């Protein structure tokens, strides 16, 4: 009696092609915040209008941020009902914050996911895996469980939670989705990132200017993607292929970006050296990623860069001698939404393909064949994703 052909079985489980992004959906809370008037609101709602010198400093930070507006769950009404959230670190507020997050993170995730599923055009019963990412939900079972329930996904959907990773995780989930899609023939992976500032919002402090900078940068948003290999002809349409991925920790960067969950919520630290640390290491990441494709002209690529702040984008652009047009989609998303942590790069991917179509480009990557996506975050960690565009027909 012949033995089981385990090798043949293993090969049958593998997809033939690269993982492809088959759909993208995004969502934001309805509350749009104008950056030009936010300093007045922020210092009034936190009871710090008397501190005019610090308020003027915050105004200058907002003016230099290159952000026009952001979307936030926290409205004046919500903050008035939860005054402890408006303190810096003087009073506990974690319970109040978590009560908000337990509702808002899954709700925003569901909205983005439904848009992605609608664009995909297939039954949600075809979703085999769920990767759920958030920096804001410590409950058990996790928000991945709640979102699967809200969407009515099949009980057998294989869930993975990516929690407490921060801003680089938009690249992390693409790396994970690639591995799942390419190693499980027929897999369709729903990837969701849902982030809200309800866990980090707090009043100003003269001794913690990094916290003040964060209050000027971050916004709320959720992204959702359908990822799968070997798109079904005439049924599914890829917008990008995920070709190669990597993660690296920047040397001598410990403590540059970090956060700690305490009774007062999630506090974060942002050192001023972050833009220089990223720009000093970005070229090594590019060489590692693209030498295998014999590409060394970075202007022949389309670019998706996590907008951790204006200074980071300026330093990366200068270090790599990028044409200013390369970061237009990235700067557009930063301007219109602020820093939405892990969800940002997916908003930029969506903007890139839409702008490519509107501008009459031949591919979803601004008429170019290949591109790069970068996520930056705590560690200091850099995620690198090599992408291939698809023709626009």
UniProtKB/Swiss-Prot annotation:
Reactions it catalyzes: (E)-cinnamoyl-CoA + 3 malonyl-CoA + 3 H(+) = (E)-pinosylvin + 4 CO2 + 4 CoA; 3-phenylpropanoyl-CoA + 3 malonyl-CoA + 3 H(+) = dihydropinosylvin + 4 CO2 + 4 CoA
Cellular component aspect of the GO annotation: cytoplasm
Sorted UniProt keywords: Acyltransferase, Cytoplasm, Stress response, Transferase
Pfam family, one: Chal_sti_synt_N
The keyword ATP-binding is annotated on this UniProt entry: no
Subunit structure, as described in the record: Homodimer.
Location of this chain's protein in the cell: Cytoplasm
Function (record text): Catalyzes the production of pinosylvin from cinnamoyl-CoA and malonyl-CoA, and dihydropinosylvin from dihydrocinnamoyl-CoA.
MF terms (GO), sorted A to Z: pinosylvin synthase activity
Annotated GO biological process: polyketide biosynthetic process
Assigned protein family: Belongs to the thiolase-like superfamily. Chalcone/stilbene synthases family.
InterPro entries: Chalcone/stilbene_synt_C, Chalcone/stilbene_synt_N, Chalcone/stilbene_synthase_AS, Polyketide_synthase_type-III, Thiolase-like
Record-listed E.C. numbers: 2.3.1.146
Binding site for substrate: 57-60, 270, 308-310
Induction, as annotated: By stress.
Name of protein: Pinosylvin synthase
Active site: 167
Pathway(s) this gene product operates in, as recorded in its UniProt entry: Phytoalexin biosynthesis; hydropinosylvin biosynthesis
Superkingdom in the source lineage: Eukaryota
């Amino acid at each position: 009696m012949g033995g089981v052909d385990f090798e043949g079985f293993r090969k049958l489980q593998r997809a033939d092609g690269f993982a492809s992004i088959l759909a993208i959906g995004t969502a934001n809370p309805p509350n749009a915040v104008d950056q030009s008037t936010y300093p007045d609101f922020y210092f009034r709602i936190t009871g710090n209008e008397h501190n005019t010198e610090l308020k003027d400093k915050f105004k200058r930070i907002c003016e230099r941020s290159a952000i026009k507006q952001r979307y936030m769950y926290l409205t004046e009404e919500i903050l008035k009902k939860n005054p402890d959230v408006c303190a810096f670190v003087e009073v506990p507020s974690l319970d109040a914050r978590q009560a908000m997050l337990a509702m808002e993170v899954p709700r925003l995730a569901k909205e983005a996911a439904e848009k992605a599923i609608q664009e995909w055009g297939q039954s949600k019963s075809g979703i085999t895996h769920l990767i759920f990412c958030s920096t804001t939900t410590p409950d058990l079972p996790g928000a991945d469980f709640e979102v699967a329930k809200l969407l009515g996904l099949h009980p057998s959907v294989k869930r993975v939670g990516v929690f407490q990773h921060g801003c680089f995780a938009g690249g992390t989930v693409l790396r994970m989705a690639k591995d799942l899609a390419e190693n499980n023939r027929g897999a369709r992976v729903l990837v969701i990132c849902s982030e809200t500032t309800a866990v980090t919002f707090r009043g100003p402090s003269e001794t913690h200017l990094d916290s003040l900078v964060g209050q000027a940068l971050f916004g709320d948003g959720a992204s959702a993607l359908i990822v799968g290999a070997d798109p079904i002809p005439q049924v599914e349409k890829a917008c990008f292929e995920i070709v190669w991925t990597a993660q690296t920790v920047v040397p001598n960067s410990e403590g540059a970006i970090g956060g700690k969950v305490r009774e007062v919520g999630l506090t974060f630290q942002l050192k001023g050296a972050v833009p220089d640390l990223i720009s000093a290491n970005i070229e090594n990441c590019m060489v590692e990623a693209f030498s295998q494709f014999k590409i060394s002209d970075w202007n022949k690529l389309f670019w998706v860069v996590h907008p951790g702040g204006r200074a980071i984008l300026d330093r990366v652009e200068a270090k790599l001698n990028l044409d200013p047009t390369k970061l237009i989609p990235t700067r557009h998303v930063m301007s219109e939404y602020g820093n939405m942590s892990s969800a940002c790069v997916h908003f930029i991917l969506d903007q890139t393909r839409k702008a490519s179509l509107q501008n009459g480009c031949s591919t979803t990557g601004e008429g170019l064949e290949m591109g790069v996506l970068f996520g930056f975050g705590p560690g200091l960690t850099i995620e690198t994703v090599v992408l291939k565009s698809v023709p626009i027909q």
